[in-house]
């Protein structure tokens, strides 16, 4: 059972809680919430960087519609660029690449990389496996078109926040198991990877009071999985924490807040990856709730953004030359 945790929140993060009302997702308010989730976060509004964003439609999974992707590329450097395949957050039920475009311009220019965002289909209209298959279609398209896109396929990785982090983790599993493109890294920011949280298991008592609550978590997972939620047949490509074998996966960066609903599942996944021989960089931020890193003025949020950017810079570097 959750206990009040406001006294544990970093004081510089309280402004976000005071500015935004508590979100209680339902089928009635989902259309309005989705519209808001398509807008860029205020922290990146008006950001300018030497990068361009172009949209393209690519072939979707067999029998499915085409997939809309956004490509963000530096304007100054000629490439070939390393590439990040990014999946947006939103509990599997909301979100869009448009919300991340300003942030991606900044990152693409700063890291000298190409960022491809996937407008994957959302639940409940498209339950599992529609969304992850859209992302896999984008991954295989990037690998196949790497030369034409001026991308260095040897430096291709996946990234996402929340549900996007869950998709990134699942995509790493799917690419391994299908013999798909080899990934250089998986960059998981407070990833949503275990449907059993708040269903058959409970997080620590101070987790999940703010922003992404147990109610919203159940809403998102139910939309994606329907009646299979919490059951033994849930696929690891829907909930990466369900995977029994984590060997052979790319190096992982995992970050989360100490008050995030996903803390326990993320810590457990990091430990299991480590035990499977996968290099893991793990960060837990005291006083941080879900999506705390969007607070521009908070030192702990600045640190989280810096750690994420620095880890990406390391992951995107060319491999050392060996004569």
What are these regions (language model features)?
Residues 143-158, 178:
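Gly/Ser-rich "nucleophile elbow"/oxyanion-hole loop immediately N-terminal to the catalytic nucleophile
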Residues 80-89:
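Short beta-strand element of the alpha/beta-hydrolase
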Residues 297-323:
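Catalytic active-site module of serine/aspartate enzymes centered on a nucleophile-bearing elbow/loop
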Residues 1-71, 316-323:
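A glycine/proline-hinged amphipathic helix-loop "lid/cap" segment
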Residues 173-232:
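Hydrolase active-site cap/lid region
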Residues 98-117:
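Short amphipathic alpha-helix adjacent to the substrate-entry channel of hydrolases
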Residues 254-256:
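Short beta-strand/loop motif that positions the catalytic acidic residue
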Residues 126-148, 308:
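Alpha/beta-hydrolase active-site loop
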